[in-house]
Amino acid sequence: DHGSHPELRTEWWYITGQVRAEQRLYGFQVTFFRSRVDGTQSMQSEFAARQLIFAHAAVTDVQGKRQFHDQRIARAGFGIADASTTDAAIRLRDWSLTRRDLPSTTAAFALSQFRTQVVASDFSLDLTMTGTQPPILQGAQGLSRKGPLPEQASYYYSEPQRAVSG
């Protein structure tokens, strides 16, 4: 279940990794958030900001010891920002993160591929991350407790060791 859950207050999708380009090592981080605005849920106007989509991204030139970063925010809708409920497909203006299942392999688990595209003022990314192992669930069956109360929890899993290209 990689899609958005609009009834929940906050969700995020993030990727971190490193990639080599032109004999240089770069670190990268891209995070998309979806946040439900509780105070606007009963409003009838299409202009009510019921869901906010925001994102930040960074690239580090390891050898050059420089970091570049940027961020975006918009309310969902109007063709500007969206987080699909059916799969990981998040878009915020010209930034995106999408997921797709890969054709069946001999692996004992289903592999998937993520792609992120980010056009920032000082950098751009177009990366594909292909799964190499099954997801790792955090906590009890992916439910990660954040406090003593049952509602103080979130579902959380990681997909490490993805093969990165782009």
Roles of regions detected by a PLM:
Residues D1-G166:
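Targeting-peptide/extracellular-domain and disordered-appendage signature
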